[in-house]
């Protein structure tokens, strides 16, 4: 399991992020910290190594950025993803300077959170798999694609236009309906895992918007609906 530490002084936000982490296979939240002092105590004294840190920046009287040089100087092996409402260029520049692997601006969509964690894991595994790289492999690792720029709306490997058309036709016929992965998968008769891959792609293309709801058990359920301003794009995939 990949151990994740959440650093955020807002208890509700920390709990929400903890639930997001719990929804991604292979990841577990091993602790939360509301101060940088508590965070350093966990990072440097935890029995299990902290693989990934989710770091807020605006923390009452503290600035989360102050943790980054501490980690850098200590040669800490934990990677950092910033999750913050800070969107100014100076803050982002400082974060990237200290090597954060991703930066999410609050409020963010659940699919973007999942993309950040799974994308980080994919790069980490790739780095551990090779001792040397050729240029094509390095381009794939750094840019996530070949050196030839690809159409961002091109379907990823494993997704088919036929199934996408079926899903989009159902969504088009239920424009005012907010649906879950399970509901759509049952309606079009495909597996939940496959359905989720298509939905994540549609969200990344800004065709769908996702929101999170909690049932009686407290388990988060992701629900989707059409983004009205991109309805014409959905119609293209219905053909």
Curated annotation (Swiss-Prot):
Domain of life from the UniProt record: Bacteria
Any one Gene Ontology cellular component term annotated for this protein: cytoplasm
Keyword ATP-binding: no
GO MF term set: DNA binding; DNA-binding transcription factor activity; phosphorelay response regulator activity
Localization per record: Cytoplasm
Gene3D superfamilies: 3.40.50.2300
Domain Response regulatory: 3-121
A matching Pfam family: Response_reg
Matching InterPro entries: 2C-system_Tx_regulators, CheY-like_superfamily, Sig_transdc_resp-reg_cit/mal, Sig_transdc_resp-reg_receiver
UniProt keyword annotations, A-Z: Activator, Cytoplasm, DNA-binding, Phosphoprotein, Transcription, Transcription regulation, Two-component regulatory system
DNA-binding residues: 181-200
SUPFAM superfamilies recorded: CheY-like (SSF52172)
Modified sites of kind 4-aspartylphosphate: 56
Family matches, as NCBIfam families: PRK10430.1 (NF007750)
Role played: Member of the two-component regulatory system DcuR/DcuS. Involved in the C4-dicarboxylate-stimulated regulation of the genes encoding the anaerobic fumarate respiratory system (frdABCD; nuoAN; dcuB; dcuC; sdhCDAB; etc.). Weakly regulates the aerobic C4-dicarboxylate transporter dctA.
PANTHER family per the UniProt record, alphabetical: TRANSCRIPTIONAL REGULATORY PROTEIN DCUR-RELATED, TRANSCRIPTIONAL REGULATORY PROTEIN DPIA
Protein's name in the database: Transcriptional regulatory protein DcuR
Source organism per UniProt: Shigella flexneri
This protein's encoding gene: dcuR
């Amino acid at each position: 399991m990949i151990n994740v530490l959440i650093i955020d002084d807002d208890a509700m936000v920390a709990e929400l992020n903890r639930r997001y982490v719990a929804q991604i296979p292979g990841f577990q939240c091993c602790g939360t910290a509301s101060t940088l002092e508590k965070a350093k105590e966990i990072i440097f004294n935890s029995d299990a190594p902290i693989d990934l840190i989710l770091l807020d920046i605006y923390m009452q009287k503290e600035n989360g950025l102050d943790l980054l040089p501490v980690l850098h100087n200590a040669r800490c092996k934990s990677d950092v993803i910033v999750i913050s409402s800070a969107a100014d260029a100076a803050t982002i520049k400082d974060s990237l300077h200290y090597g954060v692997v991703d930066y999410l601006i609050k409020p963010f969509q659940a699919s973007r959170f999942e993309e950040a964690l799974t994308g980080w894991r994919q790069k980490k595994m790739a780095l551990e798999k090779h001792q040397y790289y050729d240029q094509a492999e390095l381009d794939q690792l750094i840019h996530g694609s070949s050196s030839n720029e690809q159409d961002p709306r091109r379907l990823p490997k494993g997704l088919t236009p036929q199934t996408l058309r079926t899903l989009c036709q159902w969504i088009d016929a239920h424009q005012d309906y907010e649906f879950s992965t399970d509901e759509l998968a049952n309606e079009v008769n495909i597996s939940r895992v496959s359905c989720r891959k298509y939905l994540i792609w549609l969200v990344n293309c800004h065709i769908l918007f996702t929101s999170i709801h909690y049932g009686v058990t407290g388990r988060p359920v992701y629900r989707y609906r059409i983004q009205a301003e991109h309805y014409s794009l959905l119609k293209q995939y219905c053909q």
